[in-house]
């Protein structure tokens, strides 16, 4: 998993509440277990019309936000079914941080496991960030996970909190497999001891 330390980039304001995982990545894209290639289907029902043409009014189709790495969204982001493809699609598109007043619990957890930083902030603060993001490519934000602060385009600093263990995992790029591998010496020692003490249990 890629480390998350400091992210500087354009933030796309998505003024929609209750964005569910089917809106993030529709079910027809769930046939794959690969984490790559899903960015093409991100928000596809919002980004494209029935003919496959882009909807010019959707934020990620606007020139200023096509390369956004931060998404600022409405309340209850990531609700609906617990599909891990949702954070995969965001990450494959290039989104590394999502800011919203609240998140669905499973989506929130899946973000941390896949290298995305979800930040929950009070609604008035999110509205302030969205207003600043309206300036498009002329407004860049910096999200500093180590300092737990968001630097707005005008220099104002917004604090946020991340649970210490999750923060450490993101800073170091540790997913579940990475955490297990960190214990490889202890696992090897345990298996060696088992072979000596209980050889019958190993067949």
From Swiss-Prot:
NCBIfam families recorded: leuD, PRK01641.1
Assigned protein family: Belongs to the LeuD family. LeuD type 1 subfamily.
Domain of life: Bacteria
GO biological processes: L-leucine biosynthetic process
Subunit structure: Heterodimer of LeuC and LeuD.
Function description: Catalyzes the isomerization between 2-isopropylmalate and 3-isopropylmalate, via the formation of 2-isopropylmaleate.
Record's keyword terms, sorted: Amino-acid biosynthesis, Branched-chain amino acid biosynthesis, Leucine biosynthesis, Lyase
Organism of origin: Rhodospirillum centenum (strain ATCC 51521 / SW)
Biological or metabolic pathway of the protein: Amino-acid biosynthesis; L-leucine biosynthesis; L-leucine from 3-methyl-2-oxobutanoate: step 2/4
Catalytic activity: (2R,3S)-3-isopropylmalate = (2S)-2-isopropylmalate
Molecular function GO terms recorded: 3-isopropylmalate dehydratase activity
UniProt protein name: 3-isopropylmalate dehydratase small subunit
EC numbers on record: 4.2.1.33
Entry GO CC: 3-isopropylmalate dehydratase complex
Pfam families: Aconitase_C (PF00694)
The keyword Transferase is assigned to this record: no
């Amino acid at each position: 998993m890629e480390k998350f330390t400091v992210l500087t980039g354009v933030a796309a304001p998505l003024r929609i509440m209750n964005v569910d995982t089917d809106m993030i990545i529709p079910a027809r894209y769930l046939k794959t277990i690969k984490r790559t290639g899903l960015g093409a289907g991100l928000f596809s029902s919002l980004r494209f019309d029935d003919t496959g043409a882009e909807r010019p009014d959707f934020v990620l189709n606007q020139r200023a936000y096509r390369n956004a790495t931060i998404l600022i969204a409405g309340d209850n982001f990531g609700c609906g079914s617990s599909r891990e493809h949702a954070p995969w699609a965001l990450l494959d598109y290039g989104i590394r941080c999502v800011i919203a007043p609240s998140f669905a619990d499973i989506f929130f957890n899946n973000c941390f496991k896949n290298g995305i930083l979800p930040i929950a902030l009070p609604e008035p603060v999110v509205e302030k960030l969205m207003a600043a993001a309206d300036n498009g490519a002329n407004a860049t934000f910096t999200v500093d996970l180590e300092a737990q602060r968001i630097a707005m385009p005008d220099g104002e600093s917004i604090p946020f909190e991340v649970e210490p263990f999750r923060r450490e995992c993101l800073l170091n790029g540790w997913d579940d497999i990475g955490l297990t591998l960190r214990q490889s010496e202890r696992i090897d020692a345990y298996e060696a001891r088992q072979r000596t003490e209980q050889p019958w249990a190993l067949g």
